[in-house]
């Protein structure tokens, strides 16, 4: 179980485990997050260490369409936490909506906060049920639902 390895909870160590090294997780994580930082910089928010400088504060809206796994990588980068607890402890169904906004609590320093995560209210409003595809079996004996 991954939960027995404390490095998986550390934002600087999770990709140094044998399992993550075998899939080049550090390189992929850094590739994705550096491109994300480039996008944010183009919109006026430049990463400096563990925070973002608001060099051109604005109210731009950036819309990203991505897989849950990438969503957790981006959120973990913004929050400086390991993506492992996000991947295993959260669920964003297909077509769900997550809303992140900036707050400039201190002049020139931007914080990112999640206003909603995995919202599916638009599906319910349209009379649709959210997909079970993002989830695993609720009980092990249910052979109709996905198992690990």
PLM-predicted stretches and their roles:
Residues 1-43:
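Phosphate-handling substructures
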Residues 8-9, 69-72:
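Short hydrophobic/aromatic-rich motifs at helix boundaries and adjacent loops
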């Amino acid at each position: 179980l991954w939960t027995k390895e404390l490095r998986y909870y550390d934002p600087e160590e999770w990709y140094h485990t044998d399992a993550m090294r075998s899939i080049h997780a550090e390189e992929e994580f850094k590739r994705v997050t550096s491109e994300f930082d480039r996008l944010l910089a183009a919109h006026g928010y430049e990463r400096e260490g563990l925070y973002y400088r608001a060099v051109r504060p604005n109210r731009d809206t950036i819309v990203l369409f991505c897989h849950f796994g990438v969503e957790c990588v981006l959120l973990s980068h913004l929050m400086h936490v390991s993506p492992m607890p996000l991947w295993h402890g959260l669920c964003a169904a297909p077509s769900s909506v997550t809303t992140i906004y900036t707050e400039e609590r201190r002049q020139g320093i931007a914080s990112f906060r999640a206003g909603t995560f995995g919202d599916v209210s638009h599906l319910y409003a349209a009379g649709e049920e959210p997909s079970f595809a993002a989830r695993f079996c609720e009980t092990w004996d249910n052979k109709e639902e996905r198992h690990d």
